[in-house]
Amino acid sequence: VAGPPASGSRPPEAATVPRHAGAGSEATADVLVLGGGIIGLVTAWRAVGRGLSVVVADPEPGGGAARVAAGMLAAVTELHHGEEALLALNLRSANGWESFAAELEEAAGTGLGYRRCGTLAVALDADDRTQLRELHALHRRHGLESRWLTGRECRRLEPMLAPGVRGGLRVDGDHQVDPRRLGTALVTACERAGVDFRRAAVARLTERAGRAVGAELADGTRVSAGTTVLACGSRSSTLEGLPPHARPPVRPVKGQVLRLRVPPAFAPFLSRTVRAVVRASEVYLVPRENGELVIGATSEERGWDTTVTAGGVYELLRDAHELVPGLTELPLVETCAGLRPGTPDNAPLLGPGPLPGLQVATGHHRNGVLLTPATGEALAHSLSTGVLPDWAAPFSALRNIEQAIRDSDLG
């Protein structure tokens, strides 16, 4: 999970974890993955599939920001002006999700809650309608499939929508998955494939002669590795022992999320993900196949604070109620908050970084679940060959350094 409630500007300290059978021991592997969220896990699973020996260090594998996420696979409806470069990566990953889900479900022997249900983005007033029309035009310029619907057509698709809905975009290719089930399945698949889990927090990176050679864990274990992968999410830049020049430009972006339950008497409540911009804030409602309804999410620059606030809950319920008034009758079963790993350009940092022996898989911001298949594919390639595949090169962990060099040359 993202962590206990905390406030202030300092990152959370490494958790004290119980010693286990391997505590204080030595371990060696081809690859050491620091962080057992979905990005670290998919990296480990794909790497071991390439014949590499892999250790994952994390006190609670399968946790992280994805435990809070809604799990939208929204490459089309999440397209923002100025982020067109990210579109190709998002689409590649979205198009690979069906086969990835089938492969992972077979490997883990459990479902992921993957649903090919589509998404409906709606407008509540004239300004929202104009903004949605602009998004539709952006889709058309990029050859993306979305269909404009009138308010009446939107309500015909989703009868629970408010009468005031003015129009919408139907995107049948934007699906969803349950991130909690995804994390559980990845842990199981990794274990079955032979990944060595060390359930302890990472104390510090180990560096020798200017090269990353592994890490020390909070329980005293020392892990040596040919390549170490930094996959610590929003905390990736805070790792002890990481030289300043090798710290990725990642910051925490807080998101609060609500989980409601749809009783059988109210089912079916929504058949697909519904989203909108209300009062300049994005809100979405994601119906799970198990009767859960996820409402999210705030986007807050609050440092390391993961407190669920009355204001955050109020804003989410208020905005969601404007879309679907009937949700006020549903039981509220969970409130939670997590920290997305944000980057200056909202795009992930992948592959070899400035420190030899260290590769990076972080900075996925709001697209971590969507980009799980593509990240696993890219990191498996870079761990096997030393370089990213061509299609992932624009998201190199070195791109900020390379851009700074180009800027200095121009200056």
What are these regions (language model features)?
Residues 1-30, 49:
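Extreme N-terminal leader/targeting segments of oxidoreductases
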Residues 32-34, 223-235, 376:
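Short hydrophobic core segments
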